[in-house]
């Protein structure tokens, strides 16, 4: 996919949602129950590790409440999902990323919206 960027200087920071993107959207009332482990969407762990090996910064975002951080971190660890930061409590509404264009006119932000529960396994940046 042509992003109109200089491929030689590609240095991505990836903001990626959890529920419905990395693992299947589950029942919000079940998330905090002891032993609950979300179902990982096929290709998730491999894609995250690929991005990490390329030096991309991986920032996970979720509408889950901050009070669920400990259980969420355990779920991520159990699933083998590595990341640089975890941003909790951003709510369930639409997300808007605002970023400037580079001086040469190249884009500095892109959006990908896979269908819920289809995951990121086939995503090529």
Feature map (PLM): residue ranges:
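HAD-like aspartate-dependent phosphatase fold
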Residues: 1-125
């Amino acid at each position: 996919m042509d992003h109109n960027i200089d491929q030689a200087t590609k240095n991505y920071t990836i903001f990626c949602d959890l529920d419905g993107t990395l693992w299947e959207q589950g029942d919000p009332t079940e998330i905090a129950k002891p032993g609950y482990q979300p179902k990982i969407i096929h290709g998730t762990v491999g894609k995250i590790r690929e991005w990490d090996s390329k030096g991309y910064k991986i920032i996970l975002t979720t509408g889950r409440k901050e009070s669920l951080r400990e259980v969420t971190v355990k779920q991520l660890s159990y699933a083998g999902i590595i990341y640089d930061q975890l941003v909790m409590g951003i709510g369930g509404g639409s997300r808007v990323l605002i970023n400037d264009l580079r001086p040469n006119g190249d884009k500095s932000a892109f959006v990908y919206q896979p269908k819920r529960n289809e995951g990121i396994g086939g995503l090529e940046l």
